[in-house]
Design a protein with these regions (language model features):
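Catalytic-loop of the protein kinase fold
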Residues: 39-56
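Conserved activation segment of eukaryotic-like protein kinases, specifically the C-terminal portion
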Residues: 81-93
Length: 175
């Protein structure tokens, strides 16, 4: 275990508002690398969110570390069906109480990437029932002016993370 002193990604998002595509891509690559390592070792986090991504130190270019494995599960412990995670970051199949696997972490990374790029979550409602319905339907927008500066390829990458997570392995998207 290591002591990390750089604070949460959440706090940096609040301070910055949003990230450039280049900076967001750098952060997401780090998260994908860490999660790929976890998945290769049979661990599914199940609660990835900016509050659980910590900066190693205060440096602007500090590496990101994954924390809070309280809801994580090993794949060899059986089929995962437990509804768990943080509401805005949880994958549709979890909400639908279907069996799930590693792809739920990819979904959460897609939500985090969306927030990094525009400063707000793709799914939001005061009512959990309405929020969950949005997530299950995949209802989100690339609202102007927040997404005006994001390239088409950036939007395509975001779409890929939020829609293709069901049938992909993390290895295919860790570029």
């Amino acid at each position: 275990m290591e002591l990390v002193t750089g604070g949460e990604l959440f706090d940096r998002i609040v301070a910055k508002g949003s990230y450039t595509e280049k900076d967001a891509s750098h952060l997401i690559r780090q998260v994908l690398h860490a999660v790929s390592f976890m998945h290769e070792n049979g661990v599914v986090h199940r609660d990835l969110k900016p509050e659980n991504l910590l900066y190693y130190n205060q440096d602007e270019d500090s590496k990101i570390m994954v924390s809070d494995f309280g809801l994580s599960k090993t794949e060899d412990s059986g089929v995962m069906e437990t509804a768990c995670g943080t509401p805005g970051y949880v994958a549709p199949e979890v909400l639908q109480q279907k069996p799930y696997g590693k792809a739920v972490d990819v979904w959460s990374i897609g939500v985090i990437a969306y927030i990094l790029l525009c400063g707000y979550p793709p799914f939001y409602d005061e009512s959990d029932a309405n929020l969950f319905a949005q997530i299950i339907k995949g209802e989100y927008e690339f609202d102007a002016p927040y997404w005006d500066q994001i390239s088409d390829s950036g939007k395509e990458d975001e779409f890929f993370l939020l829609h293709a997570h069901f049938s992909i392995s993390l290895r295919t998207c860790s570029t």
